[in-house]
Amino acid sequence: MSHPLFDISGRRALVTGSSRGIGFALARGLLEAGCTVVLNGRDAGRLTKAASELPGDVHTAVFDVTDGPSVAAGIADVEDRVGPIDILVNNAGMQLRAPLLEFTDTDWHRILNTNLTSAFLVGREAARRMTERGHGKIVNICSLQSEVVRPGIAPYAATKGALKMLTKGMCADWGQYGVQVNGLGPGYIETELTQPLVEDEEFSAWVRRRTPAGRWGRTEDLVGGVLFLASPAADFVSGQVLYVDGGMTSVL
């Protein structure tokens, strides 16, 4: 028998950027835990395909998480069609690798909007309703790079470091209304988008050497952390980032 502290069956969860990769795996985990899940992205066809591959009560919501009016309309539509959002996972994100001296203004604003502004916009709209109802869980997908950085990814690390502090700020503002806001910080995770790095033997050897667990992470490694942070077991946990990185942030 499962412990009631970890029971989230019947809750409604919105996962942004969930047509593939980490977001898709987190959506699957929430569905398997008994949640109703709404997948989000900008490509309707890709979302429909993703939904067809998942079990349980799954819905889709096409809206641009970097555009305020689109987010406001999207959240309202989700609550009208599916019901009140109990759990929000701000997963939408991107990576652009380039030395800082070569990083363009356009790419800077693009990565900032995708990784940080989206969490602010979607989090704010969801929290308007959560705070009125007196409960809610928000999980922002941060990163190992919220704490440390390698050459060539400074803008990405800047957005993820800022997302860590936005998480703490959301906690400070909304905690009094029964809303817990936490972060999940993946380490190096094998996905479709990281496959070129996985196949780079020199880089993969570095990852294995630097990670006490001795391997790349898998998307399913992240599910347990999200299920915990979304559950009643985490009702007195807020403003924290749970790093799921095989121990990388703990060693030199």
Regions found by a protein language model. Give the residues of each.
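Alpha-helical segment proximal to the catalytic Tyr-Lys
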Residues: 128, 172-173, 235
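Active-site helix of classical SDR
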Residues: 123, 159, 167
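Conserved glycine-rich cofactor-binding loop
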Residues: 12, 19-20
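Short C-terminal tail/terminal secondary-structure segment
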Residues: 2-4, 148, 227, 238-252
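Substrate-binding pocket helix/loop in short-chain dehydrogenase/reductase
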Residues: 99-100, 107-112, 138, 203, ...
